[in-house]
Amino acid sequence: MEKYEKAAEIFKAFGDPTRLMILKLLAENGSMCVCKIIDELKKPQPTISHHLNILKKAGIVKARKEGTWNFYYIVDDRVKEIIKLVDEL
């Protein structure tokens, strides 16, 4: 059951257009600071942070700190393949 609960959490994280756009940016760029994601998506910082936290909680992305900046990146390359499939729809 635990495996399916984790899978459901991951699928829920994929279930939002903003999160899919964030994942597309990360798939294309490797890693990005929050400020660049905000600039690209033209959404407020609290909105982007909220979505990044959901992706992080689901284990899809991680953050690394460089000085005062947080850089986010995709943990598993299979996520990049999922984003490619979404782009082909």
From Swiss-Prot:
It comes from the Archaea. Residues 1-89 form the HTH arsR-type domain. CDD domains: HTH_ARSR. Keywords: DNA-binding, Transcription, Transcription regulation. Disulfide bonds: none annotated. GO terms for molecular function: DNA binding; DNA-binding transcription factor activity. The keyword Manganese does not apply. This is Uncharacterized HTH-type transcriptional regulator MJ1325. It comes from Methanocaldococcus jannaschii (strain ATCC 43067 / DSM 2661 / JAL-1 / JCM 10045 / NBRC 100440) (Methanococcus jannaschii).
